[in-house]
Amino acid sequence: MLPVRHGLTVCITGVGPVNAGIALGHMLALCGEYTGVLNLGLAGSFDPARAPLGACTLVTEEIWPEYGLLGDDGIDAPGLGFAQWEHGGLRVVDRLPLHTDLADIGLPRPADAVPGISLTVAGVSADARRADRLARRYRPLSENMEGFAVALACARRHIPCVELRIISNNAGSRAPEDRAFPLALAQLGTLGQNLFGTPPIRLL
């Protein structure tokens, strides 16, 4: 976590849903109230035609496809019988809608952001069969490793959560031509500059 500057606190969570949930929960507990959370990171694309390498995506809904009863036919989230969180009319099992209006948190929306569903996974899709199975079931645009945990932490504190991600790879492939991490990191730095008016952020 970096100090507050101009009303902005930067929380570097590390990789994966466990890291993300712990880091954001710790920050929210220590630093008081926030008007919103912007989750920035990388993602793998299930639809390279809509979201090619280097594209910016705006997450409309987070799905955790690894929560529930696991059998030969896949995951049955409702079958487990337990919601992860309930409040008012909202019952979160494995899906959580996100805010998509960046004005809710006082920021401009990138004109080129492609909207779509994202899956949060602890293990990225490294083969075509897994990627195809997830794509058929959930119709996602992308997959990531932190989004659902961040969104759930925000929901529990009633804080708007917006998620923007740059496509770094094509889900289901580890071929060199389907990965572009240097490009994605450069685009992520430029995105930060455009959102916050700061010099490009170098991400190593």
Language model segments and positions:
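Short, acidic/turn-prone active-site loops that include or flank metal/cofactor-
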Residues: V15-G16, E61-W64, I166-N169
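Structural motif
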Residues: T35-L38
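Mid-sequence, gly/pro-rich, charge-dense loop/helix-turn segments that line enzyme active sites
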Residues: D47-R137
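N-terminal short beta-loop-beta anion/metal-coordinating cradle
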Residues: M1-E33
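Regulatory input/activation interfaces that engage signals or partners
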Residues: C161, I166-L204
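Short loop/turn motifs at secondary-structure junctions
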Residues: E33, P52, V114, R139, ...
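A C-terminal functional module that forms or caps the active site or interfaces directly
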Residues: V121-E163, S168-G172
